[in-house]
Amino acid sequence: MNKKTIVVKFGTSTLTQGSPKLNSPHMMEIVRQIAQLHNDGFRIVIVTSGAIAAGRHYLNHPQLPPTIASKQLLAAVGQSQLIQAWEKLFAIYDIHIGQLLLTRADIEDRERFLNARDTLYALLDNHIIPVINENDAVATAEIKVGDNDNLSALVAILVQAEQLYLLTDQQGLFDSDPRKNPEAKLIPVVEQITDHIRSIAGGSGTNLGTGGMMTKIIAADVATRSGIETIIAPGNRPNVIADLAYEQNIGTKFIAHQSDRLESRKQWLFAAPSAGIITIDNGAQNAILEQNKSLLPAGIINVEGRFSRGEVVKIRTQSGKDIALGMPRYNSDALQLIKGRKSADIENVLGYEYGAVAMHRDDMIILS
């Protein structure tokens, strides 16, 4: 039975529990839950904050000027401490992790997008838990995603997750600021993110982190528009991750309509200019249209145009009908070399391989 893919984002406040350093006992409890879900067959991706806090503690809280360079210094030192903390705890359960440091450019550039996604899929397929952070040590304002809430939403889209959990020091989204209004009520379900929902989100909750409730609302909006259910929940609640995975009602759930997942991809692919044409044989046509299969090199008859890996191309039948748009795993030169060949021959012909398929079904939209 295939279990769902879940992206879990941990804010600095969740990992430090209000202290100036990573809280090892609390992280141990987090890892226990994720290990349980991992062993139960769930595909878990971690997006972690905490590098700057870890770096500051490791350097014994140095007096640094409030500059970007100072933050990048702390991130550079702290990232190794952060990943070591995760690694040591998961090793207790004999679970391997893999670190990815991303910037906005890795998400927005199509070829780098595919490379990042392929890496994530390879980790998950080999039962390795990806641990992701923004590459704060080198990212400039122009290439920063901005905060790990937004990064987690983009990662959820990248791996086509079913759910995104944003764990924080709050119980969820309230109808007013609970720190100022003791009568504030938790909003258990948000059907649609409206201006009213945005208006009740406050600022950053702690001085250790960079995100507040507003960044979580923005992230939820990005994720739910792509068909990914998003939940803001308290990171300090016992067993919160496992309970959410097994569908207990905790925190605030943002409903995603599954039609949005396909529609958002359709809009993106339809808007992109076609860079080339791949003509396929009747067997490949049947596999794509009738069996919802990926396109294999063996089914390719001809390749027209010059295009890079990840650019949008048309898939055309022998009769000249365009049946799909999609992003190929290989560029046009590579496809010319492997067309008509078995997938097992790809590495021998090219000297490398990005997988057995020329175009994955997840990167393909069928034209009506």
UniProtKB/Swiss-Prot annotation:
- MF term (GO), any: ATP binding
Swiss-Prot/TrEMBL catalytic activity: L-glutamate + ATP = L-glutamyl 5-phosphate + ADP
Protein's UniProt keywords contain Membrane = no
Subcellular location(s): the record lists: Cytoplasm
Q: Which CDD domains does its entry note?
A: AAK_G5K_ProB (cd04242), PUA_G5K (cd21157)
Arranged from A to Z, the UniProt key words for this protein are: Amino-acid biosynthesis, ATP-binding, Cytoplasm, Kinase, Nucleotide-binding, Proline biosynthesis, Transferase
So which domain of life are we looking at?
Bacteria
Under what name is this protein listed? Glutamate 5-kinase
Origin species, per record, is Haemophilus influenzae (strain ATCC 51907 / DSM 11121 / KW20 / Rd)
Instruction: Write the lineage as a comma-separated list.
Output: Bacteria, Pseudomonadati, Pseudomonadota, Gammaproteobacteria, Pasteurellales
Name the gene behind this protein: proB
